[in-house]
From Swiss-Prot:
It comes from Bacillus subtilis (strain 168). One of its GO terms (molecular function) is UDP-glycosyltransferase activity. Its EC number is 2.4.1.-. The keyword Chaperone does not apply. The lineage of its organism: Bacteria, Bacillati, Bacillota, Bacilli, Bacillales. Keywords: Glycosyltransferase, Transferase. This is Uncharacterized UDP-glucosyltransferase YojK. Belongs to the UDP-glycosyltransferase family. It is an enzyme of class 2 (transferase).
Length: 405
């Protein structure tokens, strides 16, 4: 039995994929301590593993806006993220420096995890919940945030100072700005398949593609499945971050009021059902729904294009209409369209007529469903949590044997 330190990134799309891997490692006898924000305590302790809390930095990093419309200086965001990583790493290191661990697992986008592994001089494994990124790919994604160059920002000097401090005092290994968001490991576990990964040939053996980590989730037992079990189901969700979308949700109510089947609309926690326009009889509107169970039944998924939601939709062979709002969603959306598993609507072009036209096109053209099925089969064949655990444990074994040789 090995002692494992896990450091997760706050967000459903980051925590959920890690759950299956933690569950699998625990079943192999590993003893896991999992650091995350308080919001995920119940989800983690349900696995019968130790939960420890670190400060939730998302208000500083993402801001208060959940529409995807807020423009922020990218260098300012870098600074906020580096400050958060410094604080998290300091907090965790003080708690674990006198404890005994055998290896560290962390979210690929949480630099603090890599820092802790380096400071403890332990093998490190990152869980990548987006596409695997190289420098070219990372620059493309960063371009979605950036207005002008980093050097033009009034926050650039602060960024340089923070990066230098983290390199000198925390072994952060920041050489270029994209290193702040891409904390690679001795192995990087990527939750997609090589069949869906852009530029897959550029990623070698240190990248293990396992497909999405699909695990049953607790809660929402009151969802009226009897209303959708024998229906044509259209599922609409904008995820958990960019879901303050009252105007969009009202557009959906209007566009889909004559849909021949049931429309399941997940609106998140920012908007109350009472704030929306009149809800048609063919709609089920909830703050949160059991997404996996809905996707098993859905004919079409209208999504923001978060990697986790997209992967889950395709895993269940559901064609997509993608309306990206921010971050890596633009890259994910482009790949969905490139492989033919769905269509993209740019948020600045969104209208009721375009939404209706796009939904009808994807529903009525069987090629989208066929491509979604093809990608879904590649995701299922990638190996999932079992392959992730196998790869981590084999790497740990090899490192141990090498150290003892």
């Amino acid at each position: 039995m090995a002692n494992v330190l896990m450091i997760g990134f706050p967000g459903e799309g980051h925590i959920n994929p890690s759950i299956g891997v933690m569950k699998e490692l625990k079943s192999r006898g590993e003893n896991i301590t999992y650091y995350a924000v308080k919001e995920y305590k119940e989800k983690i302790t349900a696995l019968d593993i130790e939960f420890r809390e670190y400060h939730d930095f998302r208000g500083d990093y993402f801001g208060k806006n959940a529409t995807g419309d807020e423009e922020r200086d990218f260098t300012e965001m870098l600074c906020a993220f580096l400050k958060a990583c410094k604080d998290i790493a300091t907090h965790i290191y003080e708690e674990v420096k006198h404890e005994s661990y055998d290896y560290v697992i962390y979210d690929h986008h949480l630099l603090a995890g890599k820092v802790i592994a380096n400071m403890l001089k332990l093998p490190r494994f990152s869980l990548c919940t987006t596409f695997a990124m190289n420098e070219e790919f990372a620059k493309e994604m960063m371009g979605a945030y950036m207005k002008g160059s980093l050097e033009d920002s009034p926050h650039y000097e602060s960024y340089q100072q923070l990066a230098e401090t983290l390199n000198a005092d925390f072994q952060a290994e920041i050489k270029k700005p994209f290193d702040v968001f891409l904390a690679d490991g001795d192995l990087t576990i990527v939750f997609t398949s090589r069949g869906f990964q852009p530029l897959a040939e550029q990623f070698g053996e240190r990248y293990v593609f396992v497909g999405p980590s699909i695990t049953e989730r607790a809660g929402n037992n009151d969802f009226p499945f009897d209303q959708i079990d024998n229906e044509n189901v259209l599922f609409i969700s904008m995820g958990t971050i960019f879901n303050n979308q009252k105007q969009f949700f009202n557009q959906c109510l209007e566009v889909c009021k004559d849909f021949d089947g049931k429309v399941v609309l997940s609106i998140g926690k920012h908007i109350k059902t009472s704030e929306l326009n009149d809800i048609p009889e063919n709609f089920i509107v909830r703050p949160y729904v059991p997404q996996l169970e809905i996707l098993k039944r859905a004919s079409l998924f209208v999504t923001h294009g978060g990697m986790n939601s997209t992967s889950e939709g395709l895993y269940f062979e559901t064609p997509l209409v993608v309306i990206p709002m921010g971050g890596d969603q633009f890259v994910v959306a482009d790949q969905v369209e490139k492989v033919g598993a769905g269509k993209v609507i740019k948020k600045e072009e969104l209208s009721e007529s375009l939404l209706k036209e796009t939904i009808q096109e994807v529903m009525n053209n069987r090629s989208y469903a066929e491509k979604a099925k093809e990608i879904g089969q590649s995701l299922k064949a990638a190996g999932g949590s079992k392959k992730a655990a196998d790869s981590i444990l084999e790497a740990v074994k090899q490192k141990t044997q090498s150290a003892n040789a």
